[in-house]
């Protein structure tokens, strides 16, 4: 993924550049004025979607995931750094090199690797084990030629239920109990200490860490920026995701993207997608199923909050991937959790939806 060294282009700058170009053209002037440069947002398929955790059925191999991504029309894949997909101990250098070539032969790219780390534990041995895991994930990322490793401050985890499907609530309860009574400032300090070491190791391997705006330690995108500033490493940047933003109003999303600016090197989108009739609009159900609550739909999203978010990404000159992930408790039909056909349908429609959103964002910027 290309790294951006130029300052973020604000909407005001973009409009000003476009106005100058139009004025010169109208005057018939001979001076060549460069057109405003937009970023490029490319859809990728995040392997957690086919990990065999959330649906009833087996996980795809990464080779099968690659084939699906190619067939559906995605431009890259992101690899979750845990079994059965990307656990670093399963991926020595030779295997990484072989898979890297296979991906290149398809014309796709490995958009990144996703670590599942928790640097927040009050138990030193646990933090050190997490740091060792991230070290190995950094090595694997470099061997795969991916260059970007998504990281958390804290990831409580998830588990597969005996009847099939995944849940977050048990892991979250364990995390809550482990951190009970510990000052937030201390938790923050532990996370920062680990990230300082991880960023140094990433730099040694030519890898950049992308800190995601994911709870529980991170509460707003301002926390992400604060941590990046405090670590102070060129090898730690940002993965800002719209679906988990604390506020999804258009102006707030635009400001967040603008504030992050050139630090943004990765993003994701998610959720469920459906189409009621052939050729009809793609609908996005509002799903409430995390933390052990039964799966329930609460209507449909009326506004596309991804549109202002992606428009802002394009304005800032972001050139990178936005990965699709389906990673929540899924519906039960006829007494069974839905299977891989449900996942396939969502992955196809999600790609169509995000392509349309990217195209509309571009139209609004150049019109």
Show which residues each predicted segment covers.
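Short helix/strand-capping connector loops at secondary-structure junctions
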Residues: 1-2, 322-339
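Active-site beta-loop-alpha junctions enriched in small/polar residues
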Residues: 48-50, 80-82, 115-118, 154-156, ...
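Acidic/histidine-rich catalytic cores of soluble enzymes
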Residues: 76-77, 113, 184-188, 192-304
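Active-site gating loops and adjacent loop-to-helix segments of metal-dependent hydrolytic enzymes
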Residues: 162-179, 280-289
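A short helix->loop->beta-strand "cap" motif at the edges of active sites that frequently abuts
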Residues: 108, 207, 316-320
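A short, acidic, amphipathic alpha-helical segment used as a generic capping/interface helix at domain edges
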Residues: 301-315
């Amino acid at each position: 993924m290309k790294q951006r060294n130029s300052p973020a282009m604000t909407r005001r700058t973009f409009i000003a550049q476009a106005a100058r170009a139009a004025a010169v053209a109208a005057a018939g002037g001979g001076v060549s004025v460069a057109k405003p440069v937009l970023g490029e947002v490319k859809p990728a398929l995040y392997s957690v979607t086919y990990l065999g955790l959330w649906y009833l059925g087996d996980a795809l191999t990464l080779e099968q995931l690659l084939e699906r991504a190619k067939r559906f029309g995605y431009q890259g894949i992101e690899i979750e750094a845990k079994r059965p997909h990307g656990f670093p101990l399963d991926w020595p250098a030779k295997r990484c090199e072989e898979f890297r070539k296979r991906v290149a032969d398809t014309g796709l790219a490995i958009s990144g690797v996703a670590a599942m780390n928790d640097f927040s534990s009050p138990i030193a041995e646990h933090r050190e084990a997490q740091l060792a895991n991230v070290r190995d994930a950094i090595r694997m990322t470099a061997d795969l030629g991916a260059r970007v490793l998504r990281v958390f401050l804290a990831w409580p985890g998830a588990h597969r239920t005996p009847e099939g499907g995944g849940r977050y609530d048990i892991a979250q309860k364990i995390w809550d109990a482990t951190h009970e009574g510990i000052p937030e400032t201390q938790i923050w300090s532990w996370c920062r200490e680990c990230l300082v070491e991880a960023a140094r190791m990433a730099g040694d391997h030519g890898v950049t860490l992308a800190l995601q705006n994911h709870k529980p330690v991170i509460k707003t995108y301002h926390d992400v920026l604060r941590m990046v500033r405090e670590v102070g490493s060129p090898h730690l940047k940002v993965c800002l995701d719209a679906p988990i933003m604390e506020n999804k109003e258009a102006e707030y999303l635009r400001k967040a993207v603008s504030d992050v600016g050139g630090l943004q090197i990765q993003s994701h989108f998610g959720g469920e997608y459906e189409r009621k009739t052939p050729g009809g609009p793609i609908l996005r159900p509002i799903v409430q199923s995390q933390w052990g609550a039964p799966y329930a739909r609460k209507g449909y999203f009326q506004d596309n909050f991804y549109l202002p978010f992606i428009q802002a990404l394009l304005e800032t000159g972001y050139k990178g991937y936005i990965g699709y992930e389906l990673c929540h408790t899924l519906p039960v039909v006829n007494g069974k959790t839905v299977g891989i056909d449900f996942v396939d349908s969502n992955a196809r429609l999600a790609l169509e939806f995000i392509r349309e959103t990217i195209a509309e964002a571009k139209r609004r910027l150049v019109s």
